């Protein structure tokens, strides 16, 4: 879409908006950003890849994939096992500067391990990132509005950005705080009306998120024997065996379903496809046409998933990863949606089930 000469409004400052806003601002006559709550974000540091570099990367494909299979989050990054506050302040700051300057999720996934479990450690990394935002945004008041106050760095999924914070230094960009300053009253034919004024918009973009993890399953209206709806069974939270199948829904196999290990999504999908392929080959070899996970296995794995999340600071934060989405009716109570334990342990558990002849499942 061409935004040249247009007055554009964006509602939301989550991952989608953080990616779109810098590009829209380059074209628009004016961009108004309506922010409910700010999110932490870190530099993506994407750059063009030359032919020689691409050829070198191709020679390491197997090495890269093997590395991703060996880390807890299925990324090439692995957390530093030192405790944050045990590291001298100067060394800690240098380490964070290095991570902040590198491409990818290193600042989140390759950081000190306890930033996701220890409040003091998390406060320290949050202060570091807040300092970076203040350095990059010229107006101190705007910078302060862009710094989250309701959650620490890494306790929600961290969006990666390219020039997002610098965008707010542009003369054609306005940030509207719809929680503390200008609540949105209504959308008008001319734009957005807040409690203070009308904001003219030729184009209005809703970057308000999505119903993560279980939302796609709910929208399909999946039903089991007797017309039982999966959405109703999961009303208080999903229940699955290894995130691969819920009980009571024969032949419903899920790739990247609730309660799978979280982290590098493409690698997790790859693992799920490979595992299900093995299961289907097993069924074909034994002339089986129906598979259903055993209820006791679902209960056991669901309890494992819940316990794995208890030590994480993210379990105390409202986010789509904990099942809270106030744009969706009924999504106001936290639920454990993913396995937040070690991805390698999850992979081994799945492999053990397959190697044992899938005893956790009943076949016909």
Question: Which residues fall in each region the model found?
Answer:
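N-terminal FAD-binding dinucleotide-binding subdomain shared by FAD-dependent oxidases/monooxygenases
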Residues: 1-5, 13, 28-364
């Amino acid at each position: 879409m061409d935004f040249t000469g247009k007055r554009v409004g964006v509602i939301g400052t989550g991952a989608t908006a953080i990616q779109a806003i810098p590009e829209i601002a380059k074209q628009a006559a004016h961009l108004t950003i309506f922010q409910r709550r700010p999110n932490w974000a870190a530099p993506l540091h994407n750059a063009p890849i030359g032919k020689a570099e691409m050829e070198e990367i191709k020679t390491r494909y197997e090495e890269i994939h093997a590395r991703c299979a060996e880390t807890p989050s299925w990324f090439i990054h692995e957390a530093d096992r030192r405790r944050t506050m045990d590291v001298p302040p100067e060394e800690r700051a240098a380490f964070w500067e290095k991570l902040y300057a590198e491409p990818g999720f290193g600042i989140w996934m390759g950081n000190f391990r306890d930033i996701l479990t220890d409040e003091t450690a998390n406060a320290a990394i949050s202060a570091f990132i807040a300092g970076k935002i203040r350095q990059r945004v010229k107006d101190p008041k705007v910078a302060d509005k862009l710094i989250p106050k309701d959650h620490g760095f890494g306790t929600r999924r961290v969006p990666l950005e390219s020039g997002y914070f610098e965008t707010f230094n542009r003369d054609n960009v306005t940030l509207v705080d719809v929680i503390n300053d200008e609540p949105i009253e209504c959308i008008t034919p001319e734009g957005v009306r807040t409690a203070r004024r009308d904001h003219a918009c030729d184009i209005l973009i809703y970057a308000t998120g999505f119903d993560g993890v279980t939302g796609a399953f709910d929208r399909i209206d999946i039903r089991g024997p007797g017309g039982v709806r999966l959405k109703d069974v999961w009303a208080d939270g999903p229940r699955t065996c290894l995130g691969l199948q819920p009980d009571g829904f024969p032949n419903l196999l899920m790739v990247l379903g609730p309660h799978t290990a979280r982290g590098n999504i493409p690698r997790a999908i790859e693992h799920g496809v490979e595992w299900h392929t093995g299961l289907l080959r097993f069924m074909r070899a034994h002339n089986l046409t129906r598979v259903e996970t055993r209820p006791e296995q679902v209960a056991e794995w669901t309890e494992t998933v819940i316990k794995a999340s208890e030590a994480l600071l993210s379990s105390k934060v409202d986010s789509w990863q904990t099942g809270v989405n106030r744009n969706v009716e009924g999504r106001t109570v936290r639920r454990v949606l993913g396995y937040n334990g070690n991805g390698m342990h999850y992979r081994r558990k799945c492999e053990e089930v397959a190697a044992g002849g899938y005893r956790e499942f009943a076949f016909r």
